[in-house]
Amino acid sequence: MEKNDKEKRELTIEDLPGVGDATAEKLRESGYDDIMTIAVASPKDLAEISGIAEGAAIKIINAARKYADVGNFETGEEILNKRKEIKKLTTGSSNLDNLLGGGLETQSITEFFGEFGSGKTQIMHQLAVNATMPVEKNGFDSDVLIIDTENTFRPERIIQMARAKDLDPDQTLERIHVARAYNSHHQILLAEKAADMAREYKIRLLIVDSLTSHFRSEYVGRGSLAERQQLLNRHMHDLLKFGTIYNAVIAVTNQVSANPAVFFGDPMNPIGGNIVGHTATFRIYLRKAKAGKRIARLIDSPYLPEGETVITITESGITDGEK
């Protein structure tokens, strides 16, 4: 695996059949500057963005997939070996880490949803700090991207959390790159541009806080539901593609709405319907408890059982709570 991976990295897009200097320049200008980025693209997107014919795009993508060894059947053992590349980011709470099988996985989308004040944004701030920590402290020693849709990022909170981890606050803030998204289309554009940042910095964590707020406010009523879901689907797949290509954690927050038809049990449902439900790899429901505590329930995972635990939000950040 290591030898093959090294060989893949040494290949350039000029090695692809049909990609000369002019085509390579178009592809690079459009953000397709390596084999893997092209291999996971769709022919339509590649053709539209780079200005090449769709037939040529299909040939280029097929060649890239062959070189990158993606899109083919693999044995379970081969997939298991590939999963050794997966890294896990600590949440700051051993309770929550254990619930997630060791922390947040790279190459996956982890969704935290809950009511206002349930701790979603606090966890995002903590993850941002933790990602900058050294590897020996269960961090990634990496930079972080945050797409802030509700103006909730607070550098003062980062400073508090960094000091609690014995990190230099100024250096920590320097490694966290924040972009304010003003509408859903701007949010989608920022996710697409994240790859440009990943080529300049080592990015192992991309946060979207919150995922659905703009979509929810801009697309109101059943008449606009189909368009909203289509855009949201594209956005989430862009995020997942980024996580796969750059071996990064994708952490998103989501809002909830009450179902008035539910008379027994919890009426709260996350926004986004099946699109978010099917695309998010891990889904965690946060609820308020007493004395700064929050109940975190894992409700969906490809391989972990459902379960819940207690975390505490303090001035120092996210810590364990008493069960």
Swiss-Prot record:
Species per Swiss-Prot/TrEMBL record: Picrophilus torridus (strain ATCC 700027 / DSM 9790 / JCM 10055 / NBRC 100828 / KAW 2/3)
Record flagged with keyword Transcription regulation: no
Keywords assigned: ATP-binding, DNA damage, DNA recombination, DNA-binding, Nucleotide-binding
GO biological process per UniProt: DNA recombination; DNA repair
Top-level lineage group: Archaea
Gene: radA
Similarity remark: Belongs to the eukaryotic RecA-like protein family.
NCBIfam families cross-referenced by the UniProt entry: PRK04301.1, recomb_radA
Protein name from the UniProt record: DNA repair and recombination protein RadA
GO molecular function, a single term: ATP binding
CDD domains assigned to the protein according to its UniProt record, in alphabetical order: archRadA
InterPro entries given in the database record: AAA+_ATPase, DNA_recomb/repair_Rad51_C, DNA_recomb/repair_RadA, DNA_recomb/repair_RecA-like, DNA_repair_Rad51/TF_NusA_a-hlx, Hlx-hairpin-Hlx_DNA-bd_motif, P-loop_NTPase, RecA_ATP-bd
Presence of keyword DNA damage: yes
Task of the protein: Involved in DNA repair and in homologous recombination. Binds and assemble on single-stranded DNA to form a nucleoprotein filament. Hydrolyzes ATP in a ssDNA-dependent manner and promotes DNA strand exchange between homologous DNA molecules.
Pfam families: HHH_5 (PF14520), Rad51 (PF08423)
Matching Gene3D superfamilies: 5' to 3' exonuclease, C-terminal subdomain (1.10.150.20), P-loop containing nucleotide triphosphate hydrolases (3.40.50.300)
